[in-house]
Amino acid sequence: MINEIKQDSEKRMKKTIEALHTDMSKIRTGRANASLLDHVMVDYYGSPTPLSQVANITTSDSRTILVTPWEKSMVAAIEKAILNSDLGLNPATAGTAIRVPMPPLTEERRKELIKVVRHEGEQGRVSIRNIRRDANNQLKELVKEKAISEDDERRAAEAIQKLTDRYISEVDAVLAEKEKDLMEI
């Protein structure tokens, strides 16, 4: 029972870290990143389709994303979709390829993004703490039902606390790296 609670907690904490990584990848730094366009939807013959399903997305250098549509007829639709996304990007068509230069971030925008990043990090920490609280409540329930002893509960709570500390430090590391990326010019 105790192991199941620990495993469930660890699985949920891992998912929190994965979600944090996903959220952080959506935040634009000054550097080109192909995953930045993952959430752009293109009108593909009347149905909204993710850009990654109608084109090849690569980074040609640290400041440019290169989008190569699989169908020549999609160039205009892809360009329009990138323009209409809230990413503040201005694509330029060069034949059948679309170059998306990354504009440099202003100091004001960097500070704004750092606030967003810190908020996301805090959400991650809160989520991990909530998972710890749930696990501790489950342990207390088991003690009430006399399924485990108080000593077992204390040992399990300490193990869950170590798990919590490990994942919170992981959140802090992700946060520090994203802040460093944002402050690089």
Swiss-Prot record:
Pfam families: RRF (PF01765). CDD domains: RRF. One of its GO terms (biological process) is cytoplasmic translational termination. GO terms for molecular function: ribosomal large subunit binding. It is found in: Cytoplasm. Keywords: Cytoplasm, Protein biosynthesis. The keyword Cytoplasm applies. Its main location: cytoplasm. One of its GO terms (cellular component) is cytosol. The keyword Protein biosynthesis applies. InterPro entries: Ribosome_recyc_fac, Ribosome_recyc_fac_dom, RRF_sf. Responsible for the release of ribosomes from messenger RNA at the termination of protein biosynthesis. May increase the efficiency of translation by recycling ribosomes from one round of translation to another. Belongs to the RRF family. HAMAP family: RRF. This is Ribosome-recycling factor. It comes from Legionella pneumophila subsp. pneumophila (strain Philadelphia 1 / ATCC 33152 / DSM 7513).
